[in-house]
From Swiss-Prot:
It comes from Agrobacterium fabrum (strain C58 / ATCC 33970). Keywords: ATP-binding, Cytoplasm, Decarboxylase, Gluconeogenesis, Lyase, Manganese, Metal-binding, Nucleotide-binding. The lineage of its organism: Bacteria, Pseudomonadati, Pseudomonadota, Alphaproteobacteria, Hyphomicrobiales. It catalyses: oxaloacetate + ATP = phosphoenolpyruvate + ADP + CO2. This is Phosphoenolpyruvate carboxykinase (ATP). It is an enzyme of class 4 (lyase). Its EC number is 4.1.1.49.
Length: 536
């Protein structure tokens, strides 16, 4: 085996059982990985110098093919209602077969870190057969100082071989695609998919498992910090405005997707961004556009024209086109990835039913209720006049990545909110004046004005009313914001129709929460819509 590149000589891939590989390249930089990826026929150069790769059959995550090893230590710590078990015996067969498959191959290794807080960092080794995957994960995680690589020792290893096909009968899995996590031994095996996001989300899943045991809250959120050191956390599912609203020229971006909240404050898990690229434009998102069109960035499933110019409006490969770049490509990004305890928590939702107000203040119990609910609404479609929205509840605003029971995360969040006196707000970026198809999208100018007032603390001084349906506190007015949108019922042409729609949404919340009722105390149960008085 020929090993090249800076690494710990006592910690080579042979220690992982990969000694039969033909060549192993450790910790190559961007230029080197570009050369390998292009020479291997994996990717091509765009007109502006980004590296474009296509992933074939898999253009998104494969949640149905993700497994967690069920052993003595995970038996009672994993939320098995939401995680598929794999026996240690099946995992061992899978490991042996993947190692055998790697024999004679060229492999790429990156030694990286998950977590900007040294006390809670997860040193991670990622072994890939694709050079562009190596660049992707190098962009997404935190790069240790080069001089430390010769002594690097990982706590998590990811082995990703897209050309490996799992055998459901032999390995106890669902298909030829597999993402198998052995949380006890810190090993993730990925096969049968080239979608690069599996690498990133595997690190997130492991951190989400390890950190709560240390009293650290892992969060699927974006975060920023103001000039006075006042940090804010933005929870929200896809399409709610998490990335857009946390990108504020007056505030420093900590990160756009995954963070921890520990003893000293919040910290980014990552060192990069994995931005959606569909319909990306220099007018709407100039910073992301600039970061996307430059050397060092990986474009995933973005269509190029004959001159190698990316067409960000072309969704012929997938709607889920992506751009992966290091955080320092964004001008206003934090250099440390660390900030103090949050002053404000924002929970974003895009309510297509047109019921929720543009902003509401939450008690700690209401915050836990809405965190466990993880609500947003998707528009079913516009064809043939279909206008009925579809409610989506993804607990903790990231159910696919939460190995433990949601109540563990919810209780930890509530405890931290109380301990640090954090102001919590629910922000609706969805529809006003009616449901989707009748009403209109919440004006972004109004959302930003309300958000700014919440972040500066000015909104706390407003007068509030108690929402008749949800029991949270809604401001009556704010300078520069049309008072009508603060009262959703008044924006509907038919008040009775609003009441019926609100009742319908309340019942969806209540029905969804039944699975959590036995895991929370009476104060959180009483925070259900229509039952609790507003925040003081």
């Amino acid at each position: 085996m020929n090993e090249l590149g800076v690494h710990n000589p006592a910690n080579g891939v042979a220690e992982l059982g990969l000694g039969e590989a033909s060549r192993v390249f450790y910790n190559l930089n961007e230029s080197e990985l570009y050369e390998h990826a292009i020479r291997n026929g994996e990717a091509e150069l765009t007109i502006d110098g980004a590296l474009r790769a296509v992933t074939g059959q898999h253009t998104g995550r494969s949640p149905k093919d993700k497994f967690v090893v069920r052993d003595a230590s995970t038996e009672n710590t994993i939320w098995w209602d939401n995680n598929k078990p794999l026996s240690p015996e099946n995992f061992e067969l899978l490991r042996q077969d993947m190692l055998a498959h790697a024999a004679g191959k060229t492999l790429y290794v990156q030694d990286l870190i998950g977590g900007a807080d040294e006390e809670n960092a997860l040193p991670t080794r990622v072994v890939t057969e694709l050079a562009w995957h190596s660049l992707f994960i190098r962009n997404l995680l935190i790069r240790p100082k080069r001089e430390t690589l010769s002594g690097f020792s990982q706590k998590l290893t990811i082995i990703n071989l897209p050309s490996f096909k799992a055998d459901p009968a032999r390995h106890g899995v669902r298909s030829e695609t597999v993402i198998a996590c052995d949380l006890t031994n810190g090993l993730v095996l990925i096969g049968g998919t080239s979608y690069a996001g599996e690498n990133k989300k595997s690190v997130f899943t492991v951190l989400n498992y390890l950190l709560p045991a240390k009293g650290v809250m892992p969060m699927h959120c974006s975060a920023n910090v103001g000039p006075e050191g006042d940090s804010a956390v933005f929870f929200g599912l896809s399409g709610t405005g998490k990335t857009t609203l946390s990108a504020d020229p007056a505030r420093t971006l900590i990160g756009d997707d995954e963070h921890g909240w520990g003893e000293h404050g919040i910290f980014n898990f990552e060192g990069g961004c994995y931005a959606k690229a569909i319909k990306l434009s220099s007018e709407a998102e100039p910073e992301i556009y600039a970061a996307t069109n430059r050397f060092g960035t990986v474009l995933e499933n973005v269509v190029l024209d004959e001159s190698r110019v990316p067409d960000f409006n072309d969704n012929s490969l997938t709607e889920n086109t992506r751009s992966a770049y290091p955080l320092h490509f964004i001008p206003n990004a934090s250099e440390t990835g660390i900030a103090g305890h949050p002053k404000t928590i924002i929970m974003l939702t895009a309510d297509a039913f047109g019921v929720l107000p543009p902003i509401a203040r939450l008690t700690p119990e209401q915050a836990m209720y809405h965190f466990l609910s993880g609500y947003t609404a998707k528009v079913a479609g516009t064809e043939k006049g279909v206008t009925e929205p579809e409610a989506t509840f993804s607990t903790c605003f990231g159910a696919p990545f939460m190995p433990r029971h949601p109540a563990e995360y919810g209780n930890l969040l509530r405890e931290l909110i109380g301990k640090h006196g954090v102001d919590c707000w629910l922000v609706n970026t969805g529809w006003t004046g009616g449901a989707y198809g009748i009403g209109k999208r919440m004006p972004i100018k109004a959302t930003r004005a309300l958000l700014t007032a919440a972040l500066t603390g000015d909104l706390k001084n407003a007068q509030f009313r108690t929402d008749a349906n949800f029991g949270f506190a809604v401001p009556l007015s704010l300078d520069g914001v049309d008072g009508a949108i603060l009262d959703p019922r008044s924006t509907w042409a038919d008040g009775a129709a609003y009441d019926a729609q609100a009742k319908k949404l309340v019942s969806m919340f209540v029905s969804n929460f039944t699975k959590f009722e036995d895991h929370v105390d009476s104060k959180v149960r009483d925070a259900a819509p229509g039952l609790l008085l507003a925040a003081e």
